[in-house]
UniProtKB/Swiss-Prot annotation:
Globin domain mapped to chain residues: 3-147
Organism: Pongo pygmaeus (Bornean orangutan)
Gene3D superfamilies linked: Globins
Tissues/organs with expression: Red blood cells.
Keywords annotated in UniProt: Heme, Iron, Metal-binding, Oxygen transport, Phosphoprotein, Transport
Pfam families from the UniProt entry: Globin (PF00042)
Modified residues (Phosphoserine): 14, 51
Protein's name in the database: Hemoglobin subunit epsilon
The gene coding this protein: HBE1
Xref: InterPro entries: Globin (IPR000971), Globin-like_sf (IPR009050), Globin/Proto (IPR012292), Hemoglobin_b (IPR002337), Hemoglobin_oxygen_transport (IPR050056)
Disulfide bonds: none
Length: 147
């Protein structure tokens, strides 16, 4: 289990309170699909993913990205209990969707980049470290049900 200090929690929640979940979620998932094109195979039903502009403009990518980032909101509310928070999502991604758990790490890293681009000077090394710790812990929690 990962332990977050009061300072780390404050760094994460402070930035999260300023986050536009809809915009950043679509951007994060879109960039994941562009930078790591093999991840597109999990989104066959999303329609046109033929180019970066098609991906970033795709309404299904934006909607699912919002859903993904909303689940990160659950992580922030439950930073001390991530394994339980993500148990059902872990099971879904493992047993039904068969998503390679490495993809959770990739998405987390993309999210950190999105935060850095959106928040500039507010995204200090301490804030980056707290967010990196959170996205890594979420990736571990999502991979928990894998055998």
């Amino acid at each position: 289990m990962v332990h977050f200090t009061a300072e780390e929690k404050a760094a994460v929640t402070s930035l999260w309170s300023k986050m536009n979940v809809e915009e950043a979620g679509g951007e994060a998932l879109g960039r994941l699909l562009v930078v790591y094109p093999w991840t597109q195979r999990f989104f066959d039903s999303f329609g046109n993913l033929s180019s970066p502009s098609a991906i970033l403009g795709n309404p299904k990518v934006k909607a699912h990205g919002k859903k993904v980032l909303t689940s990160f909101g659950d992580a922030i509310k439950n930073m001390d209990n991530l394994k339980t928070t993500f148990a059902k999502l872990s099971e879904l991604h493992c047993d039904k969707l068969h998503v390679d758990p490495e993809n959770f790490k990739l998405l987390g890293n993309v999210m950190v980049i999105i935060l850095a681009t959106h928040f500039g000077k507010e995204f200090t090394p301490e804030v980056q470290a707290a967010w990196q710790k959170l996205v890594s812990a979420v990736a571990i929690a999502l991979a928990h049900k894998y055998h």
